[in-house]
Amino acid sequence: MKFLAFALETNRWKKINGDYRMKKYLGGCHCGKVQYEVELNLKNAISCNCSICMKRGSLLDFIPESQFKLLCGENELQDYLFNKKLIHHYFCKNCGILSFGKGIAPGGTKEVVAINLRCLEGINLKTITIKEYDGKSR
Ligand SMILES: [Zn+2]
């Protein structure tokens, strides 16, 4: 299964289990130039072993664009594209931290935002189920 498809499947799973309580969180880079607000259910995170996720160490969750609001730092974002150039890996030009990325959902035109959960404020990673995704062999 492709990465984004897997991510969306994970999100559907949350809904099916009736635990789809959304909460607002603030997130951003390290220096604070990039800040955003997201609405999500912190239940699962995806840990991927592909070339970039491995080096970055990010824990990801995927949400529709409508649940994401960039508060500041649009001009501080540097886009990094590689491989099939489908996912925009946005990182802060000043501190280098990637707090989110964007891509198009499989078979559609809908934009999906990948949130690096490590960049959210006031969360406890120990309460989140980590799902492994084998991006390396795809
Ligand atoms: Zn920064």
Predicted regions located by residue number:
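A short Gly-Trp-Pro
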Residues: 13-28, 33-138
